[in-house]
Amino acid sequence: MLCPWRTANLGLLLILTIFLVAEAEGAAQPNNSLMLQTSKENHALASSSLCMDEKQITQNYSKVLAEVNTSWPVKMATNAVLCCPPIALRNLIIITWEIILRGQPSCTKAYKKETNETKETNCTDERITWVSRPDQNSDLQIRTVAITHDGYYRCIMVTPDGNFHRGYHLQVLVTPEVTLFQNRNRTAVCKAVAGKPAAHISWIPEGDCATKQEYWSNGTVTVKSTCHWEVHNVSTVTCHVSHLTGNKSLYIELLPVPGAKKSAKLYIPYIILTIIILTIVGFIWLLKVNGCRKYKLNKTESTPVVEEDEMQPYASYTEKNNPLYDTTNKVKASEALQSEVDTDLHTL
């Protein structure tokens, strides 16, 4: 017999069991696609400006080197500010910026203090401009650095005491697009596409790997690393890409070899799931048995009391109103009286 007061609890436990089954199957099912991607910017790039503070501008030219050249890496799509030697503007005669870009004619931007004139020659890129008016600030800015801005920039300052130069070998850095996918026969392919400079790819654990580089006309490089693992106990591999703009790590699960023995770890979720299901089912069964047993026992004990209470009025009524009971009583009374009379006569 079903126990109505247990229905809600049993339904709730069954729903919980189904939910646990679905979760365990989802967790145990192997996934051949990319599992995780992490990115960490751990390379200290040069700031967008190498300019000195105004307080550091000196009038003592002996402390300023006549010519300085600096290699400066700048990340693409950022802004960059290039500075002239730290010399006060009131001591200047002419300021000239020479810009030499790859595949383009040399560009010259000049300012003459005496006439307050500016002049440009072969300068077509509108993103390369003075920071402000050249009579107030001699710095040069590049808005939204692109690959085409890779080149050499030099500031020439002419003073009564001589000429001072500061040059920049500007190296534009391009972050590669990293992908990882699995080929057949436990082979994984990791690619760092269109990076500048070329990225470096390494694997964990190490396998039988081959790396190729493809160079593009814009100066970027695509690096492709193909790696194979013969060892069957290697289930997860990690591709680590190192680059000046930051490092990235991707990992993927390899497909098991057909017929190969599965690792014991793969069965742990199913074992745990089986134990949980058996525990819940056993608990439900005990609740059902104990509840129904108590229900039947209470019903059995209450039934005789009700029948006895119901029969007593009926029996009394029958005994009082049935003529058969009256006749019997009269006969018994007559026999008793006759017995008393006989006893008295015998005594006399």
UniProtKB/Swiss-Prot annotation:
Q: Which cysteines are joined by disulfide bonds?
A: 83-155, 107-123, 190-239, 209-227
Superkingdom field: Eukaryota
Signal sequence extent? 1-24
Q: Which InterPro entries match?
A: CD200R (IPR040012), CD80_C2-set (IPR013162), Ig-like_dom (IPR007110), Ig-like_dom_sf (IPR036179), Ig-like_fold (IPR013783)
Which stretches face the Cytoplasmic side?
287-348
Q: Which UniProt keywords apply?
A: Cell membrane, Disulfide bond, Glycoprotein, Host-virus interaction, Membrane, Receptor, Secreted, Signal, Transmembrane, Transmembrane helix
Report whether Repressor shows up as a keyword of the record.
no
**Protein purpose:** Inhibitory receptor for the CD200/OX2 cell surface glycoprotein. Limits inflammation by inhibiting the expression of pro-inflammatory molecules including TNF-alpha, interferons, and inducible nitric oxide synthase (iNOS) in response to selected stimuli. Also binds to HHV-8 K14 viral CD200 homolog with identical affinity and kinetics as the host CD200.
According to UniProt, the name of this protein is: Cell surface glycoprotein CD200 receptor 1
Q: What is the lineage of its organism?
A: Eukaryota, Metazoa, Chordata, Craniata, Vertebrata
